[in-house]
């Protein structure tokens, strides 16, 4: 029980207690001006979380405004729990990606698990049924015992939550680089389906309507989680372990069903997840978005610990809780609905007209703050930006092609690089078939999930090559979006829209802010050219350990529409005799490549270049060919270059190989990472029809020899590799490193 006396308003100011909560002197002065008096301890807490970068985006808003956020299919853009895109037939797809990086660095199992739980709540709070989960993970090198521990625990946490709740984890990506050693990135994405008339908003309309708290009880976990996520990790972060929340997937499963049932009733006015900043953000945001106020009686909050103060209740980030507004007089039916699922639903306040958030506890008013001041009026900072010193140096480097002596050994070594190697060790822990809608399981370019009751499906992917973005943030930003779209197209989908998770270092450092600005410029341009608007996302700053920032990692989560299940395409070769085509030119581009990192132990120079108009044209041609039934397999050429893409297409097949002839200098032809390229196979009898639609070069054919042989133009053999040997190297790499 906490008997600690809270400091009074004068002490808060004189002893600068607000600074410990993350507020600056200027911000505290603004609060004093807004209120016309000094704030008390609880009110200072409300402002400190709502004005943190994590909740207010005060450092990133000017940059985020550059994203294109509208389109003919967009039903809901940024600003609600998740974005929504129309997919026809009165149906829509709802999706969002969020980070849980800081909690996962401290307490990896619960950090990752509650990241999954939180993103699921964002989806069903919109009225949608969650149908798929994905993730994008970054770790240091697996040789480090600490990294092994983080990797194993994060994957176990994602699996533990997703498997228990019964939503399939259908895809994702995992990359390894030394810069993530002390600060892993854990980005979780959830996708849901909804009928247009069921869309709900997090808005508290109707004065006199009742504010209800539903779900799990409130404890002291996660207090100041939003503030913790707005500072750099350090040795003292370990002491902040209590700030990591604990998840209960079985409770959340019940919460999903109860909320989706409630959404079908006309008693519900508005609903929002209690995520970052818990009760504070949900109440202030719902009131502010509706232009209303809210009064809450905190004695009625279900509490699982004794003696909790208003400050603790308002700032707790306990999991599996929602705030709802219901029509006055309908409270009892809501209570009964939740009781049926064994969940609490408690009336704890009402909507008012005066735009104030008022909190009462033990008969006294303990806070009175304008809702807009918390939700909308955080100061916006235009941070200084300065080109990173390394950028000019990398741009001026004369790039040489790495010297490779043995092409086969190099290919086998690349297949064992953890970023390229099979992630089966990861996804075998996930239930990716639950609910039986998964058409394409993890391991191909994109996951594909059918839309029940139709012939349609969703193609879903997460992508980001942060090495390219480090070398050249603007070009790398373009590539991140383009690669996501490439993966969707290779799976037979038409790219619809993206959600993003912008993971960066400390924005107060001008060179980091420059990375943020430039990568968003690149992403925005790619989104416009490829017609994939940004419908929501998340910003995670301060990803640094001991002053070293992670690579700039703006992860892209993209959803595409497969108009007919018969268009679904995968990367593995299908039958001997099929012709192999390469779309796109190969240049000697090795900056940020797997080959460069493997040979030199670091990355440098220029990232691969990209022409977005060319990218868009190629994607359109390939999608047309797939929809016309002319394509057997399609795979985008990414890390490791053409040799790896061809190897992966053979590894995924059974008993098939390939014989291929590549033009140009051998090392570049095999391993360069030029953009906008695809490996496509076509039935011989469809050669003419395919070549009418698609500009591509035929480079060889699929064989039944179980070997991949690659020749140069003079017909000299560059490499011959047995497919079983390649599969063993590729599949065994990560388990071997974990021993």
UniProtKB/Swiss-Prot annotation:
Compartments, as annotated in UniProt: Cytoplasm
Enzyme Commission numbers on file: 6.3.5.3
Catalytic activity entry: N(2)-formyl-N(1)-(5-phospho-beta-D-ribosyl)glycinamide + L-glutamine + ATP + H2O = 2-formamido-N(1)-(5-O-phospho-beta-D-ribosyl)acetamidine + L-glutamate + ADP + phosphate + H(+)
Residues annotated for Mg(2+) 2 binding in this entry: 122, 273
Biological role: Part of the phosphoribosylformylglycinamidine synthase complex involved in the purines biosynthetic pathway. Catalyzes the ATP-dependent conversion of formylglycinamide ribonucleotide (FGAR) and glutamine to yield formylglycinamidine ribonucleotide (FGAM) and glutamate. The FGAM synthase complex is composed of three subunits. PurQ produces an ammonia molecule by converting glutamine to glutamate. PurL transfers the ammonia molecule to FGAR to form FGAM in an ATP-dependent manner.
Organismal lineage: Bacteria, Bacillati, Bacillota, Bacilli, Bacillales
Protein name: Phosphoribosylformylglycinamidine synthase subunit PurL
PANTHER family assigned to the protein according to its UniProt record, in alphabetical order: PHOSPHORIBOSYLFORMYLGLYCINAMIDINE SYNTHASE SUBUNIT PURL
Magnesium found in the keyword field: yes
């Amino acid at each position: 029980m906490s008997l600690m006396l809270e400091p009074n308003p004068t002490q808060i100011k004189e002893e600068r207690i607000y600074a410990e909560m993350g507020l600056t002197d200027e911000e505290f002065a603004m609060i004093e001006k807004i209120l016309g008096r000094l704030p008390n301890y609880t009110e200072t807490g409300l402002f400190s979380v709502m004005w943190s970068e994590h909740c207010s985006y005060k450092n990133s808003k000017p940059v985020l405004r550059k994203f294109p956020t509208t389109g003919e299919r967009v039903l809901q853009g940024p600003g609600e729990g998740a974005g929504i895109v129309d997919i026809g037939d009165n149906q829509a797809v709802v999706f969002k990606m969020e980070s849980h990086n800081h909690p996962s660095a401290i307490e990896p199992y619960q950090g990752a698990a509650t990241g999954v739980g939180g993103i699921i709540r964002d989806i069903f709070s919109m009225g949608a049924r969650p149908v798929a989960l994905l993730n994008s993970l970054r770790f240091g090198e697996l040789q480090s015992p600490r990294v092994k521990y983080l990797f194993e625990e994060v994957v176990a946490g994602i699996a533990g939550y997703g498997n228990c709740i019964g939503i399939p984890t259908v895809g994702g990506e995992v990359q390894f680089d030394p810069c993530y050693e002390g600060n892993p990135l854990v980005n979780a994405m959830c996708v849901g389906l909804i009928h247009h008339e069921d869309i709900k908003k997090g808005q508290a309309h109707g004065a006199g309507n009742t504010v209800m708290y539903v779900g799990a009880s409130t404890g002291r976990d996660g207090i100041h989680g939003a503030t913790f996520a707005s500072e750099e990790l350090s040795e003292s972060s370990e002491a902040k372990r209590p700030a990591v929340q604990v998840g209960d997937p079985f409770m959340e499963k019940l919460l999903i069903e109860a909320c989706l049932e409630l959404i079908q009733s006309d008693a519900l006015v508005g609903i929002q997840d209690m995520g970052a900043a818990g009760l504070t953000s949900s109440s202030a945001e719902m009131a502010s978005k509706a232009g209303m106020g809210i009064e809450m009686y905190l004695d009625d909050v279900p509490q699982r610990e004794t003696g909790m103060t208003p400050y603790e209740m308002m700032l707790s980030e306990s999991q599996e809780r929602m705030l709802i507004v219901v029509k006055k007089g309908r409270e009892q039916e809501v209570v009964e609905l939740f009781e049926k699922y064994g969940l609490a639903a408690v009336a704890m306040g009402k909507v008012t007209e005066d735009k104030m958030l008022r909190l009462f506890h033990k008969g006294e008013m303990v806070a009175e703050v304008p809702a807009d001041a918390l939700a909308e009026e955080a100061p916006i900072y235009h941070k200084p930006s300065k080109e990173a010193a390394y950028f000019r140096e990398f741009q001026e480097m004369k790039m040489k092609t790495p010297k490779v002596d043995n092409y086969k050994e190099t290919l086998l070594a690349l297949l064992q690089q953890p970023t390229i190697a099979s992630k089966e060790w990861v996804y075998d822990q996930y239930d990716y078939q639950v609910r039986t809608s998964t058409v394409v399981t993890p391991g191909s370019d994109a996951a594909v999930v059918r839309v029940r009751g139709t012939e349609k499906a969703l193609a879903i992917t997460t992508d980001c090559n942060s090495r390219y973005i480090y070398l050249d943030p603007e070009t790398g930003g373009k590539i991140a979006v383009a690669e996501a779209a490439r993966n969707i197209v290779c799976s037979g989908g038409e790219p619809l829209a993206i959600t993003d998770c912008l993971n960066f270092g400390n924005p107060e450092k001008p060179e980091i802010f420059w990375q943020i600005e430039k990568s968003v410029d690149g992403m925005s341009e790619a989104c416009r050219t490829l017609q994939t608007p940004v419908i929501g996302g998340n910003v995670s700053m301060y990803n640094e350990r001991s002053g070293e920032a992670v690579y700039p990692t703006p992860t892209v989560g993209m959803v595409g529409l497969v108009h007919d299940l018969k268009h679904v395409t995968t990367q593995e070769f299908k039958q001997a005799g099929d012709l192999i085509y390469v779309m796109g030119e190969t240049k000697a581009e090795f900056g940020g490549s797997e080959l460069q990192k493997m040979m030199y132990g670091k990355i440098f120079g220029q990232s691969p270049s990209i022409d977005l108009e060319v990218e868009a044209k190629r994607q359109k041609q390939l999608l047309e060919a797939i929809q016309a039934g002319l394509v057997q397999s399609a795979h985008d050429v990414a890390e490791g270059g053409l040799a790896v893409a061809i190897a992966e297409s053979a590894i995924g097949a059974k008993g098939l190989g390939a014989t291929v002839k590549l033009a140009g200098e051998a090392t570049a032809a095999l391993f360069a990472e030029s953009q906008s390229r695809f490996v496509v196979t076509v039935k011989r009898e469809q050669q003419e029809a395919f070549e009418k639609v698609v500009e591509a070069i035929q480079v060889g054919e699929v064989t039944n020899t179980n070997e991949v042989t690659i020749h140069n133009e003079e017909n000299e053999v560059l490499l011959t590799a047995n497919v079983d040997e390649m599969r063993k190297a590729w599949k065994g790499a990560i388990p071997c490193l974990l021993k």
